[in-house]
Amino acid sequence: SRRQRQMCIRDRLDMLLFVEERINTTIERCGSVISVNDFLASPDKMDIFDATCMRLQTIGETVKNIDNLTNHELLINYAGTPWRSIIGLRNIISHEYLSIDPEEIFKIVKVHLPGLLLAIQQIRNDIAASI
């Protein structure tokens, strides 16, 4: 029904907004992180690293849920974003935490998250325009 479709669209928009907020929070809270060593320099810095990993995990989990909710038909339209890698990182953080490479996390935060943010914003805009 039309109402169910609107609810489903609203759920997608809410989930995308959640991802956008998590990305913004991660970028903001890692603003003082200039090198990978900044994640490891002290117990407080290691707390930032751990919190960053947990936010990346929730981003990956939510992306996975969006993909499942849309029967794998939404994210595929945005092929420039490495969705499988985002979900894969979630799996590594969840199941292989001791094997996490701080350099990779640093690179993800500083290099890849801004692009993911743009992709999420584009998807939200495209969905909103289709309502």
Label each residue range with its predicted role:
Residues 12-54:
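N-terminal first-folded block
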Residues 26-40, 66, 70, 97-100, ...:
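Secondary-structure edge/capping motif, primarily at the C-terminal ends of alpha-helices
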Residues 82-100:
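Histidine-centered, metal-coordinating catalytic motifs and their short helical/loop contexts
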Residues 1-9:
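Single conserved hydrophobic/aromatic residue that forms the stacking wall/gate
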Residues 17-20, 24, 57, 91, ...:
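Generic structural signal for well-ordered, non-transmembrane alpha-helical segments
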Residues 55-67:
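Short, contiguous, well-structured surface segments enriched in hydrophobic/aromatic residues
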Residues 94-128:
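Charge-enriched, short contiguous segments at helix-coil
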Residues 68-84:
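Short, mixed-charge amphipathic alpha-helical segments
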